């Protein structure tokens, strides 16, 4: 399971002209689900995402996680993160989970974020989405479990 996390000052997701999720300061989480992923990996990745210390403390040092910084989380499904790009000119998605399995684990990940008392917003699974963000820093990390 893969999360591309970006520290943002604001972010939103629009589907068919409707805003489905919007946050101020916090994390935009692009989530990719691979074939061998399960709830245990989703738990571990959620723990890492919410605990990752990439927000500045009073001294300007990256020392706070999103909860400590009072931020929110916007989770967006992104199957392209599971692409194999090692060869050729076209990505292969053979490493990605089936749509049903990916959606179940995406929903599970979102629920785990909510259970941690995070203000959690979402996109819409498998939809054609427009994601807008202001990357703060820029600060972007690739987390994989």
UniProtKB/Swiss-Prot annotation:
Location(s), subcellular: Cytoplasm
Signal peptide region: none
Pfam families linked to this entry: Tyr_Deacylase
Sequence motif: Gly-cisPro motif, important for rejection of L-amino acids, positions: 137-138
Any GO BP: D-amino acid catabolic process
HAMAP family linked: Deacylase_Dtd
Protein name: D-aminoacyl-tRNA deacylase
Gene name in the database record: dtd
